[in-house]
Amino acid sequence: MESGDQAGETSKKKKKGPYMSWSDQECYELTAILVDAIKRGWRDKNGTISKTTVERKILPLLNKKFKCNKTYTNYLSRMKSMKKEYSVYAALFWFSSGFGWDPITKQFTAPDDVWAAYLMGHPNHHHMRTSTFEDFEDLQLIFESAIAKGNNAFGLGGDSNAETFEEEDDLQAGDNVNHMEINDDEVNETLPKEKLPTRKRSKTNRNGDRSDSINHGESSEKVLSEMIGVGTNIINLIQQREERHQREVEFRETEKKKNNVWDAIKEIPDLEDHIRYDAVTKIHTLNLKDVFVSMSVEERLGWIRRNT
């Protein structure tokens, strides 16, 4: 049995293929190609780039420029690293609504008290406050739409290998959701099937005169009425999508505020900063975030006085 297990493990390792490193120039070029691909509309309606598109359009450009032989497996490995990098950036905005982005300096911004609270829980992230991040906007463009739609990353559709690439879908952030995109399939499924009236062939009477069995004026009016009905249905569908999009945005904002420990602490008046910082650390250590934010302001104050 042991030899069989070892053989199975060996075969799994062989499936992964040889490891191929990525140079800085290759990483930069892949990001640039993906950004250009998005602008060209190479994503499908789910917000992802399919395996076929990656293999036929993206990797050939990269391999030709650097005279390398990157495969789809290598691409997935690099995408995993890129999404891990982006998740660190996105975590700032989930920690507190006080974080922002300066597109000129390419730096993350926040008030001093927000940075202090964040760095208390992330002592190894001091560089996030002072460093510049040239690739943030590109990574945001690459990953935000796919994440918001519930997909893992580009090229991770049904034809991808789950063993090769395992993603944690913790991040559901981002308001850059293409809710206003209406595709033909959705319209066809939502609208009733309208059948235009069949025009019957003319009949010939005994005198040889041809007369239409359907009055042409009435037929044209009916067709026009049906076309107006279809147009009205499309307009109603668009309005419904807009309303749903607005509700989803408001819901995410509400959830974001509800789950923000630091904002919940700042609602408590007359607390010194060092007590606030200690409270943040204590709450995260005890994994009591959900309980704490569900308390009233008075209950939060009582909890802090008792536990800090």
UniProtKB/Swiss-Prot annotation:
Domain of life: Eukaryota
UniProt-listed InterPro entries: At2g29880-like (IPR055314), At2g29880-like_C (IPR056253), Myb/SANT-like_dom (IPR024752)
Disulfide bonds: none
Segments for region (Disordered): 158-221
Signal sequence segment: none
Basic and acidic residues: compositionally biased ranges: 206-221
Name of the protein described by the UniProt record: Uncharacterized protein At2g29880
Taxonomic source organism: Arabidopsis thaliana
